[in-house]
C-alpha cells in the first residue's frame, strides 16, 4: 500500500505563462526508491517542494498515510545538495539539531545522533566542525540529520550533484545501504542518468513545458547491489548500459521536442 499519493497534481506560479507541473499522478510505498529525472525546467525540484509541503499545489491532492499534505512535517525528511549544516556546531550537534527543536532530551537526542552517525559510517567524527569535513562527509551528516527524526519517507534534492565522481559513487552505495537497512521509501531527483538508473526501483522521466511524466520505468539494478553485487559490476553490465542509453535517448528526444516547439 502506498504511503504517499499524488493525484492530478498541478503547479502554477504567479506570473508564469504556463504551469510548472500538470496532472502528476504518483505513489510511493515501502521498499521503493523513486527517482525523478529530466532536463532543466521539467519541474523536478518543484515536485519535491510540493511533496515536502514547502509550496501548495494549484490543483490535485497529495496525501501521506491518507492525510492531506498541507505544509512541512517531520514525517518527511529532506536532504539538499546544499546541506545547510550549522558551521558553528560540531557534527553531533548538527545531527541532533532537529531533535533539539522538537524538545527531545539531550541524552536521548545524542544517543539517536550517534546511532545515525554509525548508520552513515561517521563514528569518530562527532566532535568535528563542519568546515573540517569533505563534501561527501558533509552529505553523510545531512543524511544522518534527516534520518534522526525517523521520517516516514526521505526526500533528496540532487544530494550528490556537487561531488566528484568517486565520492558520488561512494554516496550512491551508502544510500542503497541505508535504504536497505531502514526500509524507508526514498524520492530523489537528479540530473545524472547513470545515477538514476543505478539507484531507482522506479524511474520517472519528466518532460518540460509543462512538467509532466513522460515515462515510468521499473528497474532492479539497485536491488542487485543490495543483494551483494558490486556497483562496478552492475554499471559494467550490458543490461545496465543498454538501459542507460535508452534513458539518455529519451532525455535527448525531450530536449529536441522542446527546441522544436
Curated annotation (Swiss-Prot):
It is an enzyme of class 7 (translocase). The lineage of its organism: Bacteria, Pseudomonadati, Pseudomonadota, Gammaproteobacteria, Pseudomonadales. Its EC number is 7.6.2.7. SMART domains: AAA (SM00382). PROSITE patterns: ABC_TRANSPORTER_1 (PS00211), ABC_TRANSPORTER_2 (PS50893), TAUB (PS51250). This is Taurine import ATP-binding protein TauB. It is found in: Cell inner membrane. It comes from the Bacteria. Residues 4-233 form the ABC transporter domain. ATP binds at residues 38-45. Belongs to the ABC transporter superfamily. Taurine importer (TC 3.A.1.17.1) family. Part of the ABC transporter complex TauABC involved in taurine import. Responsible for energy coupling to the transport system. GO terms for cellular component: plasma membrane. InterPro entries: AAA+_ATPase, ABC_transporter-like_ATP-bd, ABC_transporter-like_CS, ABC_transporter_ATP-bind, P-loop_NTPase. Gene3D superfamilies: P-loop containing nucleotide triphosphate hydrolases.
Amino acid at each position: 500500500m502506498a504511503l504517499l499519493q499524488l493525484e492530478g497534481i498541478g503547479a502554477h506560479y504567479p506570473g508564469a505563462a504556463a504551469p510548472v507541473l500538470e496532472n502528476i499522478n504518483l505513489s510511493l510505498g515501502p521498499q521503493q526508491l523513486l527517482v525523478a529525472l529530466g532536463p532543466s525546467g521539467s519541474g523536478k525540484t518543484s515536485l519535491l517542494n510540493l511533496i515536502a509541503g514547502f509550496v501548495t499545489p494549484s490543483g490535485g491532492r497529495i496525501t501521506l498515510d491518507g492525510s492531506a499534505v498541507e505544509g512541512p512535517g517531520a514525517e518527511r525528511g529532506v536532504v539538499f545538495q546544499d546541506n545547510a549544516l550549522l558551521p558553528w556546531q560540531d557534527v553531533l550537534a548538527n545531527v541532533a539539531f532537529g531533535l533539539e527543536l522538537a524538545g527531545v532530551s539531550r541524552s536521548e537526542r545524542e544517543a539517536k545522533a550517534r546511532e545515525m552517525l554509525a548508520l552513515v559510517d561517521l563514528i569518530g567524527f562527532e566532535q568535528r566542525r563542519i568546515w573540517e569535513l569533505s563534501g561527501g562527509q558533509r552529505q553523510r551528516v545531512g543524511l544522518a540529520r534527516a534520518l534522526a527524526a525517523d521520517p516516514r519517507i526521505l526526500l533528496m534534492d540532487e544530494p550528490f550533484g556537487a561531488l566528484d565522481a568517486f565520492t558520488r559513487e561512494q554516496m550512491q552505495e551508502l544510500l542503497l545501504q541505508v535504504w536497505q537497512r531502514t526500509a524507508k521509501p526514498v524520492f530523489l531527483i537528479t540530473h545524472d542518468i547513470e545515477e538514476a538508473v543505478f539507484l531507482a526501483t522506479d524511474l520517472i522521466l519528466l518532460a518540460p513545458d509543462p512538467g509532466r511524466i513522460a515515462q515510468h520505468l521499473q528497474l532492479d539494478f539497485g536491488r542487485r547491489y543490495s543483494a551483494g553485487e558490486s556497483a562496478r559490476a552492475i554499471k559494467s553490465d550490458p543490461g545496465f548500459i543498454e538501459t542507460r542509453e535508452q534513458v539518455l535517448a529519451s532525455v535527448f528526444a525531450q530536449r529536441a521536442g522542446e527546441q522544436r516547439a
